[in-house]
Curated annotation (Swiss-Prot):
It comes from the Bacteria. Keywords: Cell outer membrane, Ion transport, Membrane, Porin, Signal, Transmembrane, Transmembrane beta strand, Transport. This is Putative outer membrane protein ArbH. It is a multi-pass membrane protein. Residues 1-23 form the signal peptide. Belongs to the porin LamB (TC 1.B.3) family. GO terms for biological process: monoatomic ion transport. One of its GO terms (cellular component) is pore complex. It holds the Pfam family Sugarporin_N. InterPro entries: LamB-type_porin_N_dom (IPR021570). GO terms for molecular function: porin activity. It is found in: Cell outer membrane.
Length: 87
């Protein structure tokens, strides 16, 4: 178990170093293009999260409204039935 953990520690330390050596071999234009690509992917992921949050919020509102409707239907004091019209 200790050996596995030590490999994980070594791998986690070497992982950023591999990016440094790769980044050093890239031109400024290539690095900029890679950063722009990452930014675009991040924006798309953020948009997906926003859309999912809107869906979740809509589902929650529907559940709350349907629960409120069910509660109103079971309410013993129904205003529509007991109210008298004003002459």
């Amino acid at each position: 178990m200790k050996i596995k953990n030590s490999y994980l520690v070594i791998a986690s330390l070497l992982y950023p170093i591999s990016f440094i050596s790769t980044a050093a071999s890239l031109t400024v234009e290539q690095r900029l293009a890679a950063l722009e690509n990452d930014l675009q992917e991040t924006k798309q992921e953020l948009q997906r999260y926003k859309e999912q949050e809107k869906k979740n919020k809509a589902i929650t509102l529907v559940r709350v409204n349907s629960a409120a409707d069910a509660d109103n239907k079971s309410n013993a004091f129904n205003v529509a039935k007991t109210a008298t019209p004003i002459a």
